[in-house]
């Protein structure tokens, strides 16, 4: 049997590998060695008691079993950089509390950023690090201004599901990201994710794809490995309220719009010469189909409620 307690006041996390029990398993050790890039671990305590043949001292339900032994690790890590998955931006300036009990690893944080997207809360769990198919499950919330969110998207696998529409997108204004990641430790390229981005009065445009400036955007964009969607979104276009819905279809992203067309709308886009000859208002609908480097816009209206005068052949009453 072994009865060991190690206390490490301060240590560079890249050097903690000297203290990892080999019984953690090849998959877990590889992830620890390649993912913890830098940082300072403080007040690290490692306790191992029992026969190492029974490590990590859990029962059949993967619960700590004191009759078998004890394995616990606690540590507070500050200023760290962590590479949690291939192709994803690193977590930087990351302060995190680490707790290991039996075969379960728990990570908690409220400090750090991902490409300047400020972390509000972070929790990660590896339920059983001894399994060959061990997973790290992460729940993450960030305060993300839209320009910083777009930068993160364009430097992550989420860019693929955006069908080429995010690359030249410009954005500003507040928002919040909720993201769940499931990371197989033996293949960090095979991450599954699902998330949502809350527009809290943001603005965006994509001149390359003829998407005009949308301001005061409010709504919830939902996305995963395969799709994106937004229902019942709201925005302002040319000083007029607008309803928005977004979905993916085949190799394109489709944005459906509906709004009100009146003289103010026309003045904003075409000038007073046109708007002075328009009275009333009418509803209109539009569909903007966006794909990599291409866009297609279809607009329609029945003109009910609108009168157009003194415009040659366009007179309508």
Language-model region placement:
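Transmembrane beta-barrel architecture of outer membranes
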Residues: 3, 91-95, 121, 214-218, ...
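Extended amphipathic, helix-rich lipid-handling scaffolds
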Residues: 3-68, 72-82, 129-192, 196-205, ...
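Structural motif
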Residues: 101-103, 224, 249, 291
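Solvent-exposed loop/turn tips at the surfaces of repeat/solenoid architectures
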Residues: 11, 78-80, 117, 202, ...
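Repeated loop/turn-to-beta-strand initiation elements of outer-membrane beta-barrel proteins
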Residues: 104-108, 227-230
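Surface loops and adjacent helix of pleckstrin homology
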Residues: 87, 110, 209, 233, ...
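Short, surface-exposed charged micro-motifs
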Residues: 45, 95-97, 111, 123, ...
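Solvent-exposed loop/turn segments connecting transmembrane beta-strands
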Residues: 86-90, 115-118, 208-213, 237-241, ...
